[in-house]
Amino acid sequence: MTTPPNGPTTNAKSPAQMAPTQRNLLLFAGMAALLIMVGVLQSWNVAFSILNMCLISAIMALGVNIQWGYAGLFNVGVMGFAALGGLAGVVVSMPPVDAAWAAGGLGIIMGLATGIATLIAGMMVWRRGQSWGRWRYAATAVIVISGYILMRSLADPSVAAIEAVDPARTGYLGGLGLPIILSWLVGGVFAAAAAWVVGKVSLGLRADYLAIATLGISEIIIYVLKFEDWLSRGVKNVNGLPRPVPYEVDLQANSWFIALADTLNLPLVDASSLVVKICYALLFTVVLLAVLWLSETALRSPWGRMMRAIRDNETAANAMGKNVTKQHLLVFVLGSAVIGVAGAMMVKLDGQFTPTSYQPLRFTFLIWVMVIAGGSGNNWGAVLGGFLIWFFWIEAEPIGLWLMDVVTSGLPPTHWLRLHLLESAAHTRLMTMGVILLLVLRFSPRGLIPESRR
């Protein structure tokens, strides 16, 4: 007869010993608890503001995960594709500026048509003139230079005329005045079209050179949006973008909403702001779930298994007859389209298109931290990483201020060290991201929700 061990027995498991499903549920429950804590300790308006950007960040992280987690493509041009999504919001939803179209719309169309025709003609001559020897270079150069001169001669006077039309309020062509939700799809199309061009040029490069190429092209896209005022107002920004949810002032003017705010014992302004944020959260959740479902379906399909095989061993996949370059281009376009959708959603949440806010190095780093920390190759991991990293990106400042206030509470209020630490605490965001990344890589190198073994 065996003797029972001394002391009580326990069946509790550490998070690392849990089944993957239990562990994932625990992680998402912890994320929800963090958002609830913000609502209780700060305000629900702040909590839903963070939640909305977490949802957009999760969609953007899914786009990067499609490229890197599925195919191993190192895309550092994330902000360029997000900016194209933002441009789609302007082009689709803003009303057209009739005076600007009358002043130079025809010239812009003719200039763009000339530029496209020049590119097509140059490509055709380059491909078909392989037997021409040196004349091939000369003919291509003549076509490109003459086409460029003709394009500028048509477009430049029109650009000047458009930008002179009430530059304080417009100074650009405006948009099509279509429903705002449509811009989310168009944002994906814009980003996908740009990704196709970028992919045709750069996907033959090795990973490190591909990263440099995508970063450079992203900078070019943002540079164009900053300085082509006729298209996007440049650094003057486009304000007052339509949005798919009610405006706060409209809610505040309704008697039923006033009664609802009184019932909830909330100030009218706070209640209207909260309802608008909840509406955004519902819309963004629908989009996130749709993208997540499509991503999971693709990942579990034969195509998804083929992409993972290409990622793990390109040489073997190529030897088995798979067109690696074609599949890389496809997955690059799909991931960029998802990023473009997220970019279009972001400008609708902000209500303005600000080209200067797209900082490739800073925010591309943030999206990559989301994917790496959440779990590369796992869609649920990308979603969790999007939520977790954006939450701490926003909350790093108040947490840092509170921590420094506690640490220096024993010092006089005017002590130089206390003042210095309190002033510096607001700039701990990047350090916080680095600490989170190091902790994840140390204790869970494959991410919080790693790619499942198949």
Tell where the protein language model's regions lie, with residue ranges.
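Transmembrane alpha-helices and adjacent helix-loop boundaries
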Residues: 2-454
